[in-house]
Amino acid sequence: MIKVEEALTIIEANSAKMPAQQIAVSKALGYVLAEKVISPIHMPPFRQSAMDGYAFIHSIKHQYDIVSTSQAGDHSNLKLNANEAVRIFTGAFVPDDADTVVMQEHVIANKNSILIAAMPAKSANIRPKGEQIA
């Protein structure tokens, strides 16, 4: 039995390089790209919430004051403190300071604060900038 690296070397040495062709996308089934396709834009163009819930700075605390709301289409320069959270909706901008979004189903909420009943892992439920197209 040979190692994977050795097998790949043998395959590359015995494979013919095909010349690049320009063809219509509708006729491209079965072809491979000759070069990487890189988008000139990032989608989403910001860190985005993957859930309805609350964005906050992850810590061992479980209680946070609700200081703002972020809905899809909003973009804020809000600065969060360690004991603060933002009510956030799916697809909304995640404030720069926030590093985690907890699902609304995992909190006990009242008008001004939340108590996190099931603490998510740090970075949970945040889509990075450019996750869909980069």
Identify the residue ranges that each predicted region occupies.
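Short, glycine/charged-enriched hinge/interface segments at domain edges or termini
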Residues: 55-134
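Short, low-complexity N-terminal leaders and the immediately following helix N-cap/first helix
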Residues: 1-65, 112, 126-131
